Amino acid sequence: MVELRLPSNSVVKKGRVHKAQQEMLKPRKVQVYRYDPDLNKNPTIDSFEIDLSKTGPMVLDALIKIKNEIDSTLTFRRSCREGICGSCAMNIDGTNTLACIKPIEDISGDIKIYPLPHMKVVKDLVPDMSHFYTQYESIEPWLKNDNPAPSNSERLQSIQDREKLDGLYECILCACCSTSCPSYWWNSDKYLGPAILLQAYRWIADSRDDNTGARLEALEDPFKLYRCHTIMNCTKTCPKGLNPAKAIGRVKSLIAERHGV
């Protein structure tokens, strides 16, 4: 009988407890995943007590307060603080989302924060996005048109053609959807995942691009595209309210149409 075991250093252990140093008006406990590969130790869950009466309304505000006032070694990405850049994507209360737009008041009980799942962790809440960006590069996410552009203007679109990009161009590549997808967990070495496939369709749907056939051929692969099993986690978790599953379905339909199906 085959017996499978996780490496001993993959077990998450209880970490440090940072208790309140003074009385708080609105005390709240924040549990944060901590891991530093350079230390060659197990990841831990550290606990911090903070006063929400002296903290901003979003989970990112709580993390910044912890880093500034309690533990400066806590590591996470952040930038815009308004749901535009995608830097602060992480798993909060069991759901992949952006810390900067996740209200603390929406979370009952302790605030539990982990890095995006099924990605190598650089440190603490920082995932390694290298493979994700390599996959993004593979779809050639730029306008491809062999015809010269008009000399005195941009390549124009009709209002109707421009509207076809709504729900696609807004993707901020935060990877919340891809890292919520079981198919991506299992086959991320070959399956492009919902974020990249939505981005691929964004260029396929662009009327200014004349490389549609080649783009579809590049995706016609048992793993790149067809590992999508319509689980729909991607659509449920997208912090921008987009529908990657719909975009993937449209790519599949276009490929079928090319084969006369």
UniProtKB/Swiss-Prot annotation:
Cofactor: [2Fe-2S] cluster; [3Fe-4S] cluster; [4Fe-4S] cluster
SUPFAM superfamilies in alphabetical order: 2Fe-2S ferredoxin-like, alpha-helical ferredoxin
Family matches, as PANTHER family: SUCCINATE DEHYDROGENASE [UBIQUINONE] IRON-SULFUR SUBUNIT, MITOCHONDRIAL, SUCCINATE DEHYDROGENASE IRON-SULFUR PROTEIN
Residues the record lists as binding a ubiquinone: 186
Pfam families xrefs: Fer2_3, Fer4_17
The protein, known as: Succinate dehydrogenase iron-sulfur subunit
EC number(s) reported in the record: 1.3.5.1
Similarity comment text for this entry: Belongs to the succinate dehydrogenase/fumarate reductase iron-sulfur protein family.
MF term (GO), any: 3 iron, 4 sulfur cluster binding
Binding site for [4Fe-4S] cluster: 171, 174, 177, 238
GO biological process, one term: respiratory electron transport chain
Annotated binding of [3Fe-4S] cluster, by residue: 181, 228, 234
InterPro entries: 2Fe-2S_ferredoxin-like_sf, 2Fe-2S_ferredoxin-type, 2Fe2S_fd_BS, 4Fe4S_Fe-S-bd, 4Fe4S_Fe_S_CS, Beta-grasp_dom_sf, Helical_ferredxn, SDH/FRD_Iron-Sulfur
